[in-house]
């Protein structure tokens, strides 16, 4: 895969005699989520593998944070705010150097929590072009019209209709949200699910945040993905999107630029390998040989209490090793629930209000009969009266 510099250089060379200024070169990153892990570590990754790469580009016109700069509401005095603000400051300096526009888009409200407003003051500076976007609106960048769509909960459809269908053509869209056919298609959500029909007035690509796996849907809708990995069960490529958009022909080229990220892996073990010591040696060797940063071991069989204590004590202070032991509690719960369902089917008549107490009693007696000689209600009355 070409790196970002080769990507832009190839576009430049392919342009021939056409003036290179007809192109818009943009970088898109999303779902940064300060402080989902050590914010200093996040900051270092973003500086070395995002900002430093962009600095090497011959041309850079637009940098977009496509939502979820923050993971949750944080205190202004926290390390999360400190390193997030350092990152934004570095981006502002880069954009000043490159004479590029920086757009910071609000993402999911439960993540960003309007905290992107911390950077409103950059919009007052006259030596750099920064736009902090918290509402649906159009922005003009290098004579191109860009539709910006943050994620909202329960926003009236007429608001979307106004910008998507009744405001004329636009050149590209940057957003944060759900697209039909992506991960969250069938998940209950208060935010809107978009389709390609919503973008019939868009004359270029749509680049979005929200889904942590990079991908393309319906040919022109792109997810940036997240820039790094911080949890198990996430083995997707990590990085950001680099785009070159031809404002004359309306064609574009996209590249997913990879960022090296921690490797999270989960393995299953039936039980111990001979004893606790051999199991520990196996875990350590497997992690080292496979260059795994964070390893989770799920024991699918029983492990005796003494061995559990040895394993837990050895890995007690290891954040890079997670042990999950087999438990039959869930199995017992499922069995109990199944028994309840079976009994409710067997004794459904006890809850039938159309039956008399005597009829219910007769049915209960017959349900416990050891033979097929069932009694009737009249027979039971005779037995009770005798």
Question: What is each stretch, according to the model?
Answer:
Residues 185-250:
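Conserved beta-sheet core of the metallophosphoesterase superfamily
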Residues 1-86, 160-169, 374, 385-386:
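N-terminal active-site segment of His-dependent metallophosphoesterases
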Residues 31, 68, 107, 146, ...:
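Divalent metal-coordination and catalytic microenvironments
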Residues 33-37, 71-74, 103-116, 139, ...:
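Active-site environment of divalent metal-dependent phosphoester hydrolases
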Residues 17-27, 138-148, 167-172, 219-221, ...:
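Beta-strand-turn-beta hairpins that frame and shape the catalytic cleft
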Residues 97-102, 201-204:
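A short helix->loop->beta-strand "cap" motif at the edges of active sites that frequently abuts
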Residues 103-197:
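Conserved catalytic scaffold of divalent metal-dependent phosphoesterases
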Residues 2-21, 245-386:
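Accessory, non-catalytic peripheral segments of nucleic-acid enzymes
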């Amino acid at each position: 895969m070409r790196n970002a510099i080769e990507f832009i250089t190839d576009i430049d060379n392919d342009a021939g005699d056409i003036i290179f200024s007809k192109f818009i070169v943009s970088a898109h990153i999303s779902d940064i989520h300060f402080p989902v892990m050590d914010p200093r570590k996040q900051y270092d990754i973003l500086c070395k593998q995002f900002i430093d790469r962009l600095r090497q580009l011959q041309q850079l016109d637009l940098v977009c944070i496509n939502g979820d700069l923050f993971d949750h509401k944080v205190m202004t005095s926290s390390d999360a705010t400190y390193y997030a603000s350092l990152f934004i400051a570095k981006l502002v300096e880069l954009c000043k150097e490159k004479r590029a526009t920086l757009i910071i888009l609000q993402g999911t409200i439960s993540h960003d929590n309007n905290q992107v407003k911390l950077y409103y003051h950059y919009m007052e500076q006259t030596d750099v072009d920064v736009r902090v976007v918290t509402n649906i609106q159009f922005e003009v960048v290098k004579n191109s019209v860009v539709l910006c769509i943050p994620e909202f909960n329960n926003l009236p459809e007429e608001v979307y209709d106004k910008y998507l269908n009744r405001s004329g053509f636009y050149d590209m869209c940057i957003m944060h949200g759900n697209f039909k056919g992506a991960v969250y298609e069938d998940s209950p959500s208060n935010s809107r699910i978009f389709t390609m029909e919503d973008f019939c007035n868009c004359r270029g690509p749509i680049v979005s945040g929200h889904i942590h796996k990079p991908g393309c849907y319906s040919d022109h809708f792109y997810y940036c993905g997240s820039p790094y990995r911080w949890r198990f069960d996430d083995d997707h490529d990590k990085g950001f999107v680099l785009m070159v958009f031809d404002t004359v022909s309306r064609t574009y080229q996209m590249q997913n630029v990879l960022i090296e990220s921690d490797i999270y892996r989960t393995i299953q073990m039936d039980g111990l390998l001979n004893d606790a010591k051999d199991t520990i040696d196996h875990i350590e060797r497997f992690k080292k040989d496979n260059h795994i940063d964070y390893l989770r071991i799920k024991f699918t069989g029983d492990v005796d209490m003494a061995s559990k204590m040895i394993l837990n004590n050895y890995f007690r202070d290891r954040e890079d090793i997670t042990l999950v032991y087999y438990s039959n509690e869930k199995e017992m719960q499922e069995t109990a629930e199944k028994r309840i369902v079976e009994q409710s089917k067997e004794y459904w008549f006890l809850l039938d209000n159309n039956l008399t107490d005597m009829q219910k009693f007769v049915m209960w007696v017959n349900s416990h009969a050891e033979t097929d000689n069932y009694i009737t209600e009249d027979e039971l009355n005779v037995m009770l009266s005798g």
